[in-house]
């Protein structure tokens, strides 16, 4: 779809006039298309490059550059709106320090790990890179090579990377940065329902009577979705908004019931609500009897630390995800100890506020939408917390219906579509399959035309484990793509930087800008961004969206997909597979990894003539690469509850929510009449489980691995702010966003500041047991922590706050807890 600037002026004028008159124009009337010769600006659609909301924008290009963006009025997600970051999308690709050519550490004309970065050709870059990967493979085998990817990869990039690692190099050591943000959500879905991703959709916002935010500052992190909650709340007086957080933020401004709780005690609060439902006879027995089982989680499971860490050694059942059967009476007895008095005493939230929220869940006439993001997922018991909230919805039957929706929000544009659905985690394959399951491996090997036994059965190193293995010298050739983990990951000083600078290791970073990660690497590959390539993303409501390339990449930068294709050409299949595999398929002898994986009659099935004129990746390979990868990937899910539409369809629509069966998207899963996989007469079927029943899982309160003491007497919570996204790689290069919020500040309660002799603007030293950073004090403003806690965002490369964070994870999901870390604060 192409539009001119004049079309936008007309559309906006018409829409404004209609609004004044109190009428609504159809989308087609507000999105006129006129002849492109009336202006040189061309317009086309693309999903936003930032968060997991999945807003659609209209991209204006002129003279080979993106010159403007605007909210897409035809998009059902954002309905023409953008947040402040979205309005400046046109500037993210044009930072003054945009990387234009590969850079290799050199000394005396050769690669040297202690050398300075010097520009090299792509051939030279890949020559050195291939040499290092081949050396590691030959000396230590497939487990010595790895990749750290991204929820910002396109679907096709993630699919190609996962296929290259797991089928080509035969290494499961690939993990996305979504491990840091969504792994606990995945774990909760799989344990409770046996299948990943939300059963509801954004339409729930217009149907709910009550909203409960469990650790999610939607006003800043998902602002477009927050406008829908705001509209619902202000337009319907009966609607209530409940906000749970460890500190006061902008979402509290709309809250009818705002609750500040002690870190980690959300576990007790969730169990109290379940107890309240039972004690007040609010259990939906018809639903519970037909559609659920009761289970008990194994307890005292540790904190995902190194095996020799004293905290880990104390655990009775380290890393255990075992579930034990129980009946309702046993479940009732288990939650009974979580009375309102106990929950209030533990959490610091008043009994009145807890009961007010619990009543909304218990009332069968009130439709409740629970929403959460990192506050629940970045948690050493994040999987438990996800399941505890599902328990509440399952006990009341408030699930898979308009307005009744437990909804896990995502933070990255394709954490769902790429990391989760494609399966770029170290333990996963596409469509919720896992490498540990021999039947799943056999399916993947058949689709990929591989010999039996190609895919290793053992899960690879997850994100935090990759850092540890780099440091220990067991992971030696490592490719970081589309993320800035040196700034975003935990425990930078002790566990990450030592591995990058380990002389045994060779670290590659693909990025558009010289990030902290790039500067710590040995080879930097300049990467094409966003609409400089064709791609597809999958958002938080299961909506897959595609876009065409609209401008050429800058300098000699290349897309991640191009880099994967070209690198795979550097390996003969004999260099990565053993004789046992080659003997099964001798026709592969002498071929490159590229030919075996990507010229297999499926990926290269669609001719270049089907691609748009501007598609550099397709032209480089001589076939419609993106379509071939997408269609091969889609074969995993079609007929198995993960159905995707044909690739070309996505370019004609503003996304479709899977499963897409017979051309129809699915709004609510697991419910008859909406989900084609639920048989007639069953009402509900949670078909991720063999018997179609979901698990109600009891898990108790367990403390955080570290808590404040006399020396480290404050909690530290990290996170984001409205104006910046993650580590600020893109947003800090947008002048307007940088000027709005140039620095990461230490938000602190005035009483804590006064106690330490601090005033607003003072520079302070924040110290944990792992490191220290300096920043300035803020006692006013949007974020207002309670006494005993500070909030510091992580977007600022000059304030590497994650140096302070313990690399403790949820032992089940392996996701890091960034929300609670003891520190001390002193004035500089």
From Swiss-Prot:
One of its GO terms (cellular component) is periplasmic space. Its cofactor is [4Fe-4S] cluster; Mo-bis(molybdopterin guanine dinucleotide). It is an enzyme of class 1 (oxidoreductase). It is found in: Periplasm. Substrate binds at residue 794. Its EC number is 1.9.6.1. This is Periplasmic nitrate reductase 1.
């Amino acid at each position: 779809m192409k539009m001119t600037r004049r079309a936008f002026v007309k559309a906006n004028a018409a829409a404004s006039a209609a609004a004044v008159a109190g009428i609504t124009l159809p989308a087609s009337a507000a999105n006129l298309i006129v002849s492109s010769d009336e202006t040189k600006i061309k317009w086309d659609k693309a999903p936003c490059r930032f968060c997991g909301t999945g807003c659609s924008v209209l991209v204006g290009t002129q003279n080979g550059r993106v010159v403007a963006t605007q909210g897409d009025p035809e998009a059902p997600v954002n309905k023409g709106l953008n947040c402040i970051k979205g309005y400046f999308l046109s500037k993210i690709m044009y930072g003054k320090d945009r990387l234009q050519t590969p850079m290799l550490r050199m000394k005396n004309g050769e690669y040297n790990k202690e050398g300075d970065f010097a520009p090299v050709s792509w051939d030279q870059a890949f020559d050195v890179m291939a040499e290092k990967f081949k050396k590691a493979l030959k000396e230590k085998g497939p487990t010595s090579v790895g990749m750290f990817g991204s929820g910002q990869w396109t679907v096709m990039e993630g699919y190609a990377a996962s296929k290259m690692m797991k089928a080509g190099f035969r290494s499961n050591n690939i993990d996305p940065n979504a491990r840091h943000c969504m792994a606990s959500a995945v774990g909760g879905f799989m344990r409770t329902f046996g299948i990943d991703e939300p059963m509801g959709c954004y339409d729930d916002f217009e149907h709910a009577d009550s909203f409960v935010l469990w650790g999610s500052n939607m006003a800043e992190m998902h602002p477009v979705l927050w406008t829908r909650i705001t509209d619902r709340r202000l337009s319907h007086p009966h609607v209530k908004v409940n906000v749970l957080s460890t500190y006061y933020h902008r979402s509290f401004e709309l809250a009818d019931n705002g609750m500040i709780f002690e870190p980690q005690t959300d576990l007790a609060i969730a169990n109290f609500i379940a107890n309240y439902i039972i004690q007040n006879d609010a259990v939906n027995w018809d639903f519970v009897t037909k559609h659920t089982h009761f289970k008990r989680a194994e307890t005292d499971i540790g904190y995902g630390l190194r095996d020799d860490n004293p905290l880990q050694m104390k655990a009775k059942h380290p890393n255990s995800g075992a579930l034990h059967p129980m009946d309702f009476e046993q479940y009732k007895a288990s939650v009974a100890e979580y009375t309102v008095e106990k929950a209030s005493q533990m959490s610091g939230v008043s009994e009145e506020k807890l009961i007010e929220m619990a009543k909304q869940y218990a009332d069968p006439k009130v439709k409740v939408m629970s929403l959460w993001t990192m506050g629940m997922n970045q948690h050493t018991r994040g999987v438990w917390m996800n399941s505890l909230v599902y328990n509440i919805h399952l006990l009341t039957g408030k699930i898979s219906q308009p307005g009744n929706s437990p909804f896990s929000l995502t933070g990255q544009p394709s954490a769902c579509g790429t990391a989760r659905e494609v399966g770029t985690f170290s333990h996963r394959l596409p469509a919720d399959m896992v490498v540990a399951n021999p039947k799943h491996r056999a399916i993947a090997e058949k689709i990929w035309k591989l010999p039996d036994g190609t895919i290793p059965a053992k899960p690879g190193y997850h994100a935090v484990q990759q850092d540890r293995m780099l440091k220990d010298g067991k992971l030696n050739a490592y490719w970081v793509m589309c993320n800035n983990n040196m700034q975003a990951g935990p425990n930078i000083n002790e566990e990450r930087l030592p591995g990058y600078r380990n002389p045994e290791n060779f670290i590659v970073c693909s990025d558009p800008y010289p990030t902290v990660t790039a500067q710590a690497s040995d080879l930097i590959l300049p990467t094409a961004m966003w609409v400089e390539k064709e791609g597809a993303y999958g958002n938080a409501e299961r909506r897959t969206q595609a876009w065409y390339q609209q401008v050429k990449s800058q300098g000699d930068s290349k897309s991640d997909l191009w880099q994967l294709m070209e690198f795979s050409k550097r390996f003969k299949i004999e260099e990565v597979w053993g004789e046992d595999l080659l003997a099964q398929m001798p026709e592969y002898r002498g071929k490159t990894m590229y030919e075996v994986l990507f010229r297999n009659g499926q990926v290269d099935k669609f001719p270049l003539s089907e691609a748009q004129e501007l598609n550099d990746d397709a032209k480089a390979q001589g076939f419609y690469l993106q379509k071939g990868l997408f269609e091969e990937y889609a074969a995993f899910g079609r007929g198995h509850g993960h159905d995707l539409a044909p690739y070309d369809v996505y370019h004609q629509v503003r996304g479709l929510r899977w499963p897409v069966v017979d051309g129809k998207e699915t709004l609510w899963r697991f419910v008859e009449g909406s989900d084609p996989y639920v048989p007639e007469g069953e009402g509900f079927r949670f078909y991720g489980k063999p018997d179609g029943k979901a698990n109600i899982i009891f898990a108790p309160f367990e403390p955080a691995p570290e808590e404040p003491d006399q020396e480290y007497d404050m909690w530290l919570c990290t996170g984001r702010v409205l104006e910046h996204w993650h580590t600020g790689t893109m947003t800090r290069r947008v002048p307007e966003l940088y000027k709005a919020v140039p620095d990461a500040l230490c938000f602190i309660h005035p009483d804590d500041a006064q106690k330490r002799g601090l005033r607003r603007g003072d520079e302070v030293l924040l110290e944990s047991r792992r490191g220290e950073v300096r920043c300035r004090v803020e006692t006013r403003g949007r974020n207002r922590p309670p006494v005993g806690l500070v909030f510091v965002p992580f977007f600022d490369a000059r304030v590497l706050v994650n140096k302070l964070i313990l690399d403790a994870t949820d032992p089940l999901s392996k996701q890091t807890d960034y929300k609670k870390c003891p520190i001390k604060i002193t004035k500089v």
